[in-house]
């Protein structure tokens, strides 16, 4: 029988410098109890290559979380600046332990408590319109730092994962002429292990794209959405640098433009796929997902309007 007692505090601070400038910070705690299977001291032999045994001495894990944000707005200029940061730390984190059985391909998995888990996240965004809000510039960025711990053959392994991303965006809005958005971003994902024999990993991703609408003769619209992704550092069998293009033509007619005929072409280069990287325990998983490919769609939209008299 185990008995636990936790005091879970929380705090909030808000300060308004003015109607256009504010700062707030929060702290809270929470705990997670080990589940039945993690506590059960009976071996699960359903998979002889991975025998799982619980640990009845596990303690609950406790998470401390802090976040803060700052926002400043200039209503006259339409300018916005936002800053955000967060920090999470876990005490007595419940982690898996894996021990290889000598001269076999089998392993024994169990659970233990350990400290050293934390993650830090920060992001910012700056937006500024020009020329009576016809042109808008936006710059944003974000970064993560995650520190994870596993045990392999009773040896502690620390996986330090760092991710950061920068993005630039330009928007053009000319009424009844064009709405256009151009964006580009660069991100990097780096994982470093403390245990020898595990290779460090570094991947990079560069993305750029353009999307918008052009308006002709008050009833004809041409829309487009193009993006290109360039990946490096992934496993060679996963490397894919898709260029994705979508086009549509839209014609509005009838009184008050109540009817719209639209033709869409999706993924015209037939390259739609995605690559992601997940880091957990002593494993790095690269995933490639092939999504719905090139296709076309013709649609008719009729808008019913009820004008009260």
Range-by-range predicted roles:
Residues 1-309:
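Exposed, low-structure sequence patches enriched in small/polar residues
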């Amino acid at each position: 029988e185990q008995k636990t007692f936790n005091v879970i505090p929380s705090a909030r601070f808000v300060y308004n410098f003015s109607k256009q400038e504010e700062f707030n910070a929060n702290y809270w705690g929470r705990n997670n109890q080990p589940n039945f299977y993690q506590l059960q001291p009976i071996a699960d032999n359903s998979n002889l290559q991975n025998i799982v045994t619980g640990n009845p001495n596990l303690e609950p894990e406790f998470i401390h979380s802090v976040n803060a944000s700052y926002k400043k707005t200039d209503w006259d200029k339409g300018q916005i600046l936002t800053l955000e940061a967060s920090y999470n730390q876990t005490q007595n984190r419940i982690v898996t332990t894996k021990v290889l059985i000598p001269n076999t391909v089998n392993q024994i998995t169990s659970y233990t408590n350990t400290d050293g888990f934390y993650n830090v996240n920060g992001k910012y965004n700056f937006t500024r319109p020009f020329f009576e809000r016809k042109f808008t510039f936006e710059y944003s960025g974000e970064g993560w730092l995650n520190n994870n711990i596993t045990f392999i053959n009773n040896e502690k392994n620390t996986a330090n994962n760092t991710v950061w991303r920068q993005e630039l965006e330009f928007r053009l809005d000319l009424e009844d002429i064009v709405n256009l958005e151009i964006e580009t971003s660069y991100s990097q994902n780096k994982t470093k292990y403390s245990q020898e024999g595990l290779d460090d990993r570094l991947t990079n991703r560069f993305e750029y794209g353009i999307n918008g609408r052009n308006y002709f003769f008050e009833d004809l619209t041409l829309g487009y959405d193009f993006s290109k992704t360039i990946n490096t550092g992934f496993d060679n069998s996963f490397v894919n640098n898709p260029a994705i293009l979508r086009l549509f033509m839209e014609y509005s007619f009838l009184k008050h433009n109540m009817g719209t005929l639209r033709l869409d072409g999706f993924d015209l280069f037939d390259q739609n796929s995605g690559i992601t990287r997940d880091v957990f325990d002593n494993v790095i998983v690269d995933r490639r997902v092939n999504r719905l490919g090139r296709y076309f769609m013709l649609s008719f939209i009729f808008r019913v309007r009820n004008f009260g008299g």
